[in-house]
Each structure stands twice: as C-alpha cells, then as structure tokens.
C-alpha cells in the first residue's frame, strides 16, 4: 500500500460522515504520489497526515432575532486549515447545505489553490447553515452581526482573512466588516470582497469569471487556438458565470446557454451578460420573491427557457464547457453527452463541480480538463491583491488589477502545464495543479519543523 493510500484509508475510517471531504482528499492524494516518490523526506516527516488535518476548527452557535421577533439559532464554522505559506485565506459560505465536512473539503482545496496563485496565503474556509434566500436585509444584517460577534476573536489581517462565497456577497461582507470594526475598534483589511468605498478592490467582482477565461484562453493559445468562433456552454448564472460570459464574448467566443436551479436558457444570439447581471441583482435584492433566470427571455425574445434541471445545458453541442455553479453538478452522464457532442475543453469555474467519474471520463477521451483549484483561482488571487492594497493604504485602478490578474492566471497555467510534463503526465492538468500547489506548501511545512 502506497503512502497516499495509507493516509486515505485512515481518513475514510476516521471521517465516514464527511463524504465531500473524502472526495476532495481522494482526488488530491490520488494524484500526488509521483511527487512523494521523488521526495521521501515528506513521508518521514508525516507530512500528508498533517496536511489533511486542519490546524484549527472553530464551531459556534449563531443566535439572531428575525423580523417577527422570534429567536433563531444557526451553526457557524471556521476551518483554519493550513498557514504554512501565509495567513488562512478562504471564503464564508451561507447555505443550508453547509456542514463541517463540506467546509473541510473546500478548505483542503483552498490550500492548493492559494499556493498556485504564488501569493502568500494559507488555506481556510468557513460559513453557516443559515439560508439568506427569502430573508430581509434586516434579518441578514442581524445574522451577520451575530456571526461576527464570535468569529472576530479568531481572525485578523495577519491571522485569518475571510471573504465571500456562496450566499455571501458584497452586502454580507459589509455587514460582517462593520461588526468587526465595531467590536475591535480597528480598521484593518480583515475581510476581502469589501465595497469600493471602504477598502475593496476594483475587479474583485469580475475576478473569478475573468480568471477562468484567461486560464482557458492560455491553454488555447498554447495549442495555437483562441476563443474566436468557439461555442461555449456555462452551468450557473451567478457572479462567476456572469463575468465568464462577458470575457468569453470579449475574446470572440459565443456562450450558447446558462442555467439556474429552476432550469436553463438558450440564446442563439449568444447569452447577454448584462441581462444575466440584471436578473442576478434582482435575486440578490431580496425585494423580488421568485425571481428566476426565466426572466432572461423577457428581455431577449429570441432566447428559449427550459424549465427543469439546469444540467440540461450539458446536452448542447459545444467546444468548451464551463461549470460555474456548485459541487457535483457535472456527472458522468453529462460528461458522456459533452464528449459525444464534440466538447474539447472543460474549465471549472466552481469548486469541484465535476465528479471524479466525470473527470476520469474526460481525461480518457482526450478532453482538456482544467481543475477548479487552478482555473477558478482568480477570485482569491484578487482577494490577495486587495490585502496588498489594504496593507499599503492604496487603491489600484481596474486596469492595474485586471492586468495583474491576467498575468498571474496565464502564468499559473504554464506552472500547472510544466509540472504535469515534469512528472511525465503531459496534458493531465489535475495532476499538474495538485503537485504544483502541494510542493510549495510541503516544502514550507518541512522547513518549519513539526508544527
């Protein structure tokens, strides 16, 4: 039994109730054995055993009062996973599906993702099973203030810097930041994704979607191709999807379809990101109950709305597929449909949206598969640039931030590509990303001793 298999079997026995975490660990550990073979000192230092266990987990109750005066109680978490290369960095997710296992999966992925950015950021993740959907602004503010009243003692600009994630946008980050400032009497860059009027960075909103497209475009360039004339399908219609759609169009491609939890929309003229943005903002406002992507056809009469599972987008013929919604939303049967319909490139805009079976099928059938820990790192990358701006007490222009984002994402592709080639796995970008991200963290942990 190999070192990675041994550690994985121990994890499965220890955490049988955390399937998402086991899935992430399986995907990562299953690809880094070549690096471990080249560095036997890692096993001697029990480095993997330390890597897969968080340095610290904070769990707490979050009591708050709703608009009817009734006390509600949710559960809050912060998984401070690894700080070998910098302060813990990773988003907060507010969603009823949030569990400790899910946050450990996201935190483990975040370690390698942050390492790949080349910026000094460790890995962490947090959140709550609170559901912001259908809540008033007042209720969301009360919840965020209660959440931060416990979290504030565990974070700081040089300790742990949270950001937004699913269910946590600019509004929630602002409420969290305000409460942190109130409790500590300090204005520090303790959160990223802030508003522009209080320390936020230009291009942060666009960063994940733009970064995804820059990464995929650099792959296409390495093959002597471009987005020009390519047909693209996108799963999702949130922040990542909107700006991926915009950047694809700017580079000459056409997005044929996108989706939400109620169905999917197909536009033969190409999805208009401004309409997507309008629908997304109405959803986020909290004033319009029942807003869905079906509204798209009100403004674009040539478009067709398909009620049902948003995974219907995977049935369309396309050159490039960009899953930008949630984990495990591109299944084996979807991969089979995409391959049958001519898809050549898949770039993950979300965290682990593709199942292991689907990923394997893509790789076995010659599809260039770009894993999320590299392809969607644009968001955390610009979060790191926001931390730099806060530390310098400066604000950079949109063009400066976007330029750094593009440069770093394109450089990241070559790091991943070169690492895959170095370990005899040319074209295996999953292995390239995992090994490249792992090596930097592993060397830092080794140098710092048993800690």
Which residues does each predicted region cover?
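Predominant activation on well-ordered alpha-helical scaffold segments within soluble catalytic domains
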Residues: 8-9, 26, 100, 104-108, ...
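N-terminal ligand-binding/catalytic initiation module
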Residues: 1-202, 440-449
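Solvent-exposed alpha-helices and their adjacent loops that cap or buttress functional pockets
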Residues: 52-54, 67-71, 120-122, 188, ...
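Glycine-rich phosphate/diphosphate-binding loop of Rossmann-like nucleotide-binding domains
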Residues: 200-315
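Active-site nucleophile and cofactor-binding loops and adjacent substrate-binding regions
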Residues: 69, 165-166, 201-208, 233-237, ...
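General beta-strand structural signal in soluble alpha/beta enzymes
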Residues: 159-163, 187-191, 234, 257-260, ...
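Adenosine-phosphate binding glycine-rich loop
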Residues: 2-19, 24, 337-451
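Rossmann-like adenosine-cofactor binding region
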Residues: 263-369, 374
């Amino acid at each position: 039994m190999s070192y990675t298999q041994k550690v994985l079997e121990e994890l499965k026995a220890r955490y049988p109730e955390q399937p998402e975490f086991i899935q992430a660990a399986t995907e990562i550990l299953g690809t880094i054995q070549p690096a471990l073979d080249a560095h036997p000192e890692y096993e001697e230092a029990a480095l993997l055993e330390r890597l897969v266990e968080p340095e610290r987990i904070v769990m707490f109750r979050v009591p708050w009062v709703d608009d009817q005066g009734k006390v509600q109680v949710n559960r809050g978490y912060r998984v401070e996973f690894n700080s070998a290369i910098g302060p813990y960095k990773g988003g907060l997710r507010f969603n009823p599906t949030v569990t400790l296992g899910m946050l450990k999966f996201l935190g483990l992925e975040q370690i390698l993702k942050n390492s790949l950015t080349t910026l000094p950021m460790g890995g962490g993740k947090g959140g709550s099973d609170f559901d912001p959907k259908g809540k008033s602004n007042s209720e969301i503010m009360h919840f965020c203030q209660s959440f931060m009243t416990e979290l504030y003692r565990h974070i700081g600009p040089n300790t742990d810097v949270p950001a937004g994630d699913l269910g946590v946008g600019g509004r929630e980050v602002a409420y969290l930041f305000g409460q942190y400032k109130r409790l500590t009497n300090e204005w520090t860059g303790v959160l990223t994704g802030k508003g522009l009027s209080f320390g936020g960075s230009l291009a942060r909103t666009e960063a994940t979607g733009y970064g995804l497209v820059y990464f995929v475009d650099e792959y296409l360039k390495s093959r002597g191709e471009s987005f020009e004339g390519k047909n693209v399908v996108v799963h999702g219609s949130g922040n990542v999807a909107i700006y991926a759609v915009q950047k694809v169009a700017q580079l000459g491609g056409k997005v044929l379809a996108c989706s939400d939890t109620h169905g999917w929309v197909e536009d033969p003229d190409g999805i208009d990101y401004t309409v997507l943005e309008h629908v997304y903002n109405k959803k986020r406002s909290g004033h319009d109950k029942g807003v869905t992507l079906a509204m798209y056809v009100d403004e674009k009469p040539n478009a067709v709305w398909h009620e049902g599972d948003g995974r219907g987008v995977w049935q369309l013929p396309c050159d490039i597929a960009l899953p930008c919604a949630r984990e495990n939303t591109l299944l084996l049967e979807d991969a089979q449909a995409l391959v049958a319909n001519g898809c050549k490139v898949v770039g993950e805009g979300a965290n682990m949206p593709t199942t292991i079976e689907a990923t394997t099928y893509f790789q076995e059938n010659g599809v260039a598969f770009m894993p999320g820990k590299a392809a969607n790192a644009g968001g955390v990358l610009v979060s790191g640039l926001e931390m730099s701006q806060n530390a310098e007490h400066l604000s950079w222009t949109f063009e400066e931030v976007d330029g750094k984002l593009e440069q770093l994402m394109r450089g990241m592709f070559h790091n991943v590509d070169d690492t895959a080639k170095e370990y005899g796995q040319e074209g295996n970008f999953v292995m390239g990303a995992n090994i490249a991200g792992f090596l930097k963290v592993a060397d830092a942990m080794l140098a710092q001793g048993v800690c």
